[in-house]
Amino acid sequence: MVDITAAELRAAEKIFGDRLDLAKRYVEHLATSGTERGLIGPREIPRLWSRHVLNCAVIESEIPQGSRVADVGSGAGLPGLCLAIARPDLELTLIEPLERRVIWLQEVVDDLGLDNVTVMRSRAELAVGHVEADVVTARAVSALTNLAGLTIPLLGGTGEVIAIKGRSAGEEIEKAAKAIRKLGGVETSVLTVGDNLLEEPTTVVRIVVNKPQKKS
């Protein structure tokens, strides 16, 4: 069983509520089969809660009730599965191109009984038109200049991108500003999330998208 500190437990209880047992089970999947199949490095096991699960799950506070969420490059389900557990009101599509990861994700979804999750094997750019999303999430996929092109088109013209980023978020926004505007991004900001829950809060880039409709 993966150890959880008192502070991490308090944060997890706040975020997951009565679904905390599902979150714990998910963490066990990450620590066992997730590590065995190369989705998570073995050195990450002691910090699965702090660096991965809680770090991702806190962004649920930024997602409107009942949203359809597409998680790009879902990998080990970070943040997609964290959001599905914390927020049963959300409808999640996990977009992941690698078959071995897709198989693992589906196994975890089935084991946890998450009926608000669809796992899709696809590259993000090929999923456009096949996914309906109000919010697109991503973590550690690529630089924001590239990430904008992978995420914004999935919104179909309006919605939000919420990307978990590091300390260079502001610098990335400057470099990506032109690409974001071209794709329909009207407002881009850096947010700090979970500062009242986590020792190291999560930095996210939020892109509000409202692409003008083409005149017929």
UniProtKB/Swiss-Prot annotation:
It is an enzyme of class 2 (transferase). InterPro entries: rRNA_ssu_MeTfrase_G (IPR003682), SAM-dependent_MTases_sf (IPR029063). One of its GO terms (cellular component) is cytosol. S-adenosyl-L-methionine binds at G73, L78, A124, E125, R139. Pfam families: GidB. It is found in: Cytoplasm. GO terms for molecular function: rRNA (guanine-N7-)-methyltransferase activity. Its EC number is 2.1.1.-. Keywords: Cytoplasm, Methyltransferase, rRNA processing, S-adenosyl-L-methionine, Transferase. Specifically methylates the N7 position of guanine in position 518 of 16S rRNA. Belongs to the methyltransferase superfamily. RNA methyltransferase RsmG family. This is Ribosomal RNA small subunit methyltransferase G.
